[in-house]
C-alpha cells in the first residue's frame, strides 16, 4: 500500500490483462486489488465500502471471467490490529464482556446451568465450545455507544457472530439473544445435537446462522432482524416450529446443499418468506406467511451448485405480491 506505483484511485475499476482480484482489511479499512500475472505486479488497489467487502466474502468460491481469463477471487484476511483472544478462566453464572477482545468459553462438559453473557463493548465477540446438557444461555447487548455498530458486522478475526458456537454438542439447550449488533446475532458451526428453544430479538443484521451442522430444534422464535431471520447452509436441520416476524429480507434462507425439514412455520412481515438456493432441499409440512413480497423462492445463485427444491404440504400465504418465484434450475411443489 506504500508503493507509489500502485494506483489508488477510487474510480479505478477496470481490470486490464489476465489476473485475479483479492481483498483484505488493513487497519480497519477495506481494500480490493487486482494482480496481473503477465506483468507480475499489482495493477491497482482501492478502498471499498464494508458492504462491497461483505459481498466479496459471501461470493467466495465463485469464479470470475476477466478479459476472457477465469480466476477465483482471494480473500487475504486481516492485517494489524487483530483482536486479542482471552480465554475465560473460571466457570460462573454471569460474564461481563467489556473489552475489545474475542472471549473463548471452553470448559468441556456442562450440565444444568444458566449462563449469562453481557456484551459491554461493541468489539467484543464470544466463542463457545463444549458439550452442554440442559444449559440455558442468555446473551444481552449492554453497549450504549452505537456509533460503530455499522462497522462491527465482521470482527478482525472474521467472526460473523457476536456469539459463535464451534464444534459444540447440544442436548436440551435453550438460547436467548437480545439486541445484538454483529453480522449474525448467533452463529452455530460444525455442531450437532438437540436444542429446545432459540429466541432472538432485535438483531441489527441476521438473527440466527447455522452452518455445517446437524441439529434438531424444537422451537425458534425471532422478532426483528434487519436482514434474514434464519440462515442455514451446508447441513441437515430439523425445526419443529418456527415463529418469525419483522425479517428485513428473508424469513428463512436455505443454501449450499442444506436439507431443511420444517414441521410448522409462521412468518410475518418479510421480503421473502422462504428462499431455497444452491442445491438445497427444503421440506415444510405446514406454513403460514403474511405480508411478504414473495412467499416462496427457489433458485441457483452460485455456479458450482445446481438448483433448489421446495416441497410444502400445507401453505397459507396472504397479502403477498408474488406467491412463488422459481428459476429454470429449481422446483417448487405445493400440495
Where are these regions (language model features)?
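Extracellular beta-rich repeat passengers
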Residues: 2-335
